[in-house]
Design a protein with these regions (language model features):
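Terminal hydrophobic membrane-targeting helix
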Residues: 20-105, 118-119, 123-139, 169, ...
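Membrane-proximal interfacial segments on either side of biological membranes
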Residues: 46, 60-63, 95-160, 171-174, ...
Length: 492
């Protein structure tokens, strides 16, 4: 028994001695420099670029490895990417990255320079600082499974600020599977149950592709992405619920079964669509088909109030009651195009085309109706139901509008409208085959309604200065008798 105890004690003493020797050796400059050189060599091969690190710390008792001051430069054809990590800790199968910095520089001016309507996001100018904690659940030669259980990333200048990130990732190095992903940007929360991704391979000629196997869901506050993409959303604090299936490649995106709604469900939208030519801003095409959009009384105005734009005809918008829409819209380079059918409690409007031209700063379009109760829409009881087709053009240039307001004042939009009225009713008068022309300089709107018959032409000129007081419109009638004019010509 004594012999056994001596042997056991000798083995333990030897192990402790070896641990002490290993601990002392590992903490010598020679061993640490060797380990640092080995780690840098492996990272350089993996990243295919020169990697630098200031120092390495190995804790033999806690089984931890810390790398400090890691940095690398990835040179691209158009952009240089700078990567650095203040410290990286390996503890068993857990990895902790502190102050991982990713900086890109394409040596060009920022895309929003001189363009205040554009957001600050620019892939050629990023300065992201991230902290990440992950655990490697499984790692073999041909597969890996890891859990990211804590992550943050911020780029103060662009407004990119992910304050919570976690997900589970599995890969066979040909495909990537992401499960139970959660991302929070400000107050916006995105849940991604599952995404399958085919990783690109130049050698095999395989491109990137991906698709969600279950709908992505989110609670979106558009204000959270305003600095990133468009300052116009800076006041949009109305929460929106989103559900969508997403698929695509590195050059396309497809959105199926889109469901968007407000928390009170007074506004709901169902649609599908996609984006083509992501890599070419000149060919970029965003197209959506709206299967159904419903906006209950007041909800359309509530959404419009979220935008910092001049609000015109808001009273008339309220008169429309519940609004529905079914149609299509496309966003092309410097142009947005809409079409479809708008339903209201006072009648339907066929939106044959509506074009917003960002180059000329004009909105133009063509609309028609067979049953619109125009008087109820405008708040003018004397006008009844109307059947008509109309074309219009309005000026949306801030510069031109500001100049006009300085000179004339006024509360009206600037533009023109021309309509062919098949049938309408004004007081007791029933009108057929009439034409209407209206023009507004922003301060005063003038209109002329002409009703032609075989015997006479009836003309009604009108003026108004405020769309909220249409009932105060001044109307001047005039009549031209054709019969006498015709007889006079025959006599001559």
């Amino acid at each position: 028994m004594k012999t056994l105890l001596k042997i056991t004690g000798g083995i333990l003493a030897t192990i402790i001695l070896l641990m002490i020797i290993a601990f002392i050796a590992i903490n010598t400059d020679y061993v640490q420099n060797k380990a640092l050189h080995y780690a840098i060599e492996k990272l350089s091969k993996r990243l295919k670029t020169e990697v630098k690190a200031e120092r390495i710390s190995i804790n033999f008792l806690k089984f931890t490895l810390d790398l400090h001051g890691i940095s690398a430069v990835l040179h691209g054809k158009k952009t240089d990417n700078f990567l650095s990590v203040k410290s990286m800790r390996l503890r068993g199968y857990s990895v902790e990255l502190n102050e991982l910095k990713f900086v890109t520089d394409n040596y060009k001016p920022r895309k929003n320079e001189g363009r205040p309507k554009r957001g600050w996001f620019d892939a050629g100018h990023l300065d992201i600082t991230a902290n990440l904690k992950l655990h490697i659940n499984h790692w073999q030669k041909d597969s890996i499974n890891a859990s990211i259980f804590e992550g943050t990333a911020i780029d103060t200048l662009s407004g990119f600020h992910i304050n919570d990130l976690h997900m589970q990732v599995t890969s066979d190095f040909k495909n990537l599977y992401v499960q139970n992903a959660f991302i929070r940007q400000g107050n916006t929360e995105i849940h991604i149950p599952e995404v399958e991704m085919q990783l690109p391979s130049k050698k095999k000629g395989i491109g990137l592709s991906y698709h969600t196997t279950k709908p992505l869901t989110a609670r979106v506050i558009l204000q959270d992405i305003s600095r990133l993409f468009t300052p116009a959303l800076a006041q949009f604090t109305l929460p929106l619920g989103l559900s969508v299936n997403v698929s695509g490649t590195d050059n396309t995106m497809v959105f199926d079964d889109i469901q968007i709604k407000t928390e009170d469900e007074k506004f709901q939208l169902a649609a599908s669509g996609g984006i083509e030519h992501l890599k070419n801003k000149y060919l970029l095409n965003i197209s959506f088909h709206v299967d159904k959009m419903t906006a209950k009384q007041g909800s359309a105005a509530q959404i419009i109030q979220q935008f910092p734009v001049k609000k015109y005809m808001m009273k008339q918008l309220g008169n429309l009651g519940n609004i529905s829409y079914k149609g299509d819209f496309s966003v092309l380079r410097k142009r947005e195009v809409f079409s479809g059918l708008i339903g209201t409690v006072v009648g339907d409007i066929s939106l044959q085309s509506l074009i917003i031209n960002d180059s000329t700063k004009y909105i133009s379009g063509k609309v028609g109706t067979n049953n619109l109760e125009l008087g109820k829409a405008l708040g003018m009881d004397d006008i009844g139901k109307i059947m008509a087709d109309a074309t219009f053009e309005f000026d949306i240039s801030k510069e031109r509008t500001a100049k006009m307001r300085q000179q004339l004042g006024g509360k009206l939009p600037m533009g023109t409208l021309k309509a062919k009225v098949d049938e309408a009713k004004y007081k007791v008068l029933k009108v057929k085959n009439a034409t209407l022309e209206m023009s507004s300089n922003g301060a005063v709107a003038e209109g002329l309604l002409v009703i032609s018959s075989r015997i006479l032409d009836s003309k009604f000129s009108c003026t108004f200065t405020d769309t909220n007081e249409m009932h105060k419109m001044k109307v001047k009638p005039a009549v031209k008798v054709k019969l006498f004019s015709k007889k006079k010509k025959e006599k001559d």
